[in-house]
């Protein structure tokens, strides 16, 4: 029990370190700035898509009212009036103006994907058709699905099974928790679809639940602060709603990005969370897997390593394979896998060490045991190498500099 609690706190510290290393607060600030410009275009696109279908007439305004009542603190009433006025004016734009609004909405989606790719260590963003289809699906199908879901829930809520004398027990409670369930579904979809990498659905679901609960708690605390500490009105006066709304957007993005760190961290085994293996050991383990696959006539994918128990992060996989490719040790196949393209019988460990761009691991960084047949010999060799290095270069730097100066004077 104590070990599980320690692991939980250790994992939490790991997530906080990753969140700060990935510049989470800075990314949240950038997304807040982008959201400020994109919220009106997104609402305009949503209303335009829904108004194009007669069955969804008036649903857009109901969705907006529902969102502001359930997902934004009580200070959002003033902002809602502003946004409604801006949106009604935006509907009168020309085609050029509509194109600009669409570009602004796309810019927000690009910023979100960039932030998520940073968290997942994805170097190649979506390009071309795949990027266009994803964003078009969000901008076109998203409002339609929202409208269909809202219309369906409104119809169900009007049935006698819910509001009549024969109402089923528990259905009313289900209606009350519907905003939380919608938040879970939305965050799960975001974490599973936006990063340009494979995200296990169960991890995305865990992140969706965590983010939705944290989001709801933050909304309640934010509302309490606004209600009981109104000193901000003395500073901003009639404009107090605007900075509060910006602060809420910033906190929301902080929560979303931290949830993304959680989803990404769930894919790392405890060994990688606590102390990553030295790069040299990972390179040799990777070469062994590549060599075994070559003997079987198969290629190697990152998912193959994960199935074998080596939870190698994607960014480290890319770094090491990039180095191997530079040394002409591996080649990428047409299906995205990797194979050896050099005979390892004619490539020594000394060559690998001399070309290795990462420093050799110190003795304290080496694990006591590793399930690899070559590790005991390598560990002893590295210890002997470090001992010899200490004997040769153990003198003080001042002595070395003085000795070099004496040689120059001679």
Swiss-Prot record:
It is a multi-pass membrane protein. Its main location: membrane. GO terms for cellular component: plasma membrane. The chain crosses the membrane at residues 36-56, 93-113, 132-152, 167-187, 204-224, 238-258. It is found in: Cell inner membrane. It holds the Pfam family Virul_fac_BrkB. The keyword Cytoplasm does not apply. Keywords: Cell inner membrane, Cell membrane, Membrane, Transmembrane, Transmembrane helix. The keyword Transmembrane helix applies. NCBIfam families: PRK01637.1, yihY_not_rbn. Belongs to the UPF0761 family. This is UPF0761 membrane protein PST_2825. It comes from Stutzerimonas stutzeri (strain A1501) (Pseudomonas stutzeri).
